[in-house]
Amino acid sequence: MNAYPTASTPRLWVFNPGHEEALSFSREKRYTLSKEIRWMRHELSPLLRLLASGEDLIYAPASPEGIPARLLNAEGDDLPAGCDLPAELSVVLWGLDDHIVRELRECPLFLSTTLLFPPITPSYLRLSHRRASYDLLAYLTDQLGYPSDLLPRWIEAGVDKSDTELRLRAAIEGIKSRPLGDPTRVLIKRPYSSSGRGVFPLPLPLQEKHLEALVGSCTRSGSVSIEPYLEVIDNWALEYTRSESGEISFFALSHFDTLPSGRAYLGNILTSPEDLWERLTSLISEEALLALINAQCTWLEEELSDSQYTGYIGIDLFFYRDGEHLRLHPCVEINLRTTMGVLAHFAYEQYVPDGRKGVFRLERGPRQQPSQSIIPLLLTSSEAHFSAYIELEK
């Protein structure tokens, strides 16, 4: 079931990955997206047909090379030139941020259409900050007994460079002293970032050039997270929906791959919900999984009690190696937005034949050629910067 049920007002679906970093810039400032993110927005927007239906439209932003923004129908096809638009469109953003709202308000495609935007509330901004992941992890540590050594150290920028440097040195030493994690490095995360962006390892022992760069990053962003560098073995996510009444409901499991660096999304395992559940409960007990889901739902409902946010929420997990044991990190990050795991869920429902399994792939470069095992999800040229496809098990 879609978290955005079909309504009387047609919807405008907008794919705006990278919105987390945009949140760190005030609405008065012009935020410049990286070229890579602009190509992602331009080329991957048709994937939102997995969510759209009926009279819905999809907004495909302009490319970095000047290809203008365009509108697609719910099947992902270009609207004919001069096509009349609905008088109103209810905007459904991949992730909320003021900069995409301004882009849409100023877009000439919508001169004769009223766009209805979701509100961006203080509680939404609070939970979009990586500090929220710390707060949820602390709650799970207290309620369910997960190890406190997983908790990051959040360091706010000091009054000057020297003060910031002292704070960072102390935090790094504190993380190093823990029995958990790789002793040759720690992990640094910027406050508004996700899906591998704004995350980088810091080698130890600490070198002055690396410390100087870290001080600069902390000063620019206002804070950074420092946490143990763990050997990630398996990546999962718990996907939730939040209704207009504020109820948080479990939606689906997501089992995904990352690039060899371990910090960037590569693709999702496509199989039945029952099979995903069986796979995950082979690694932790069903009782522990249900307790985790219930605890996360409780925390999310409380933290979003004054929010008007409706839609998807993804909480990333991973299994890491601790000596001879495989252990669960129950909250790596919170994604208060639609996720690739949600798209993969609907790709499985809509494209994978009964009884088959596969992988949802998102890759740089042109698409794989269609075959009995490859199902392209985008119509792209040989010059495409990104491709998305399903690879069925043979």
Question: Where is each model-derived feature located?
Answer:
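Conserved N-proximal alpha/beta basic substrate-recognition cap immediately N-terminal to
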Residues: 37-47, 51, 59-176, 193
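ATP-grasp fold ATP-binding core
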Residues: 154, 178-201, 222-232, 315, ...
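N-terminal-proximal low-complexity accessory segments that begin disordered
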Residues: 2-51
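A long amphipathic alpha-helix within ATP-dependent nucleotide-binding catalytic cores
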Residues: 221, 250-253, 262-327, 363-366, ...
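Glycine-rich phosphate-binding loop of ATP-grasp-fold ATP-dependent ligases
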Residues: 154, 185-211, 237, 261-277
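C-terminal active-site "lid" helix and adjoining low-complexity regulatory extension at the edge
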Residues: 325-328, 336-394
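Phosphate-binding site of ATP-dependent enzymes
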Residues: 184, 210-265, 318-331
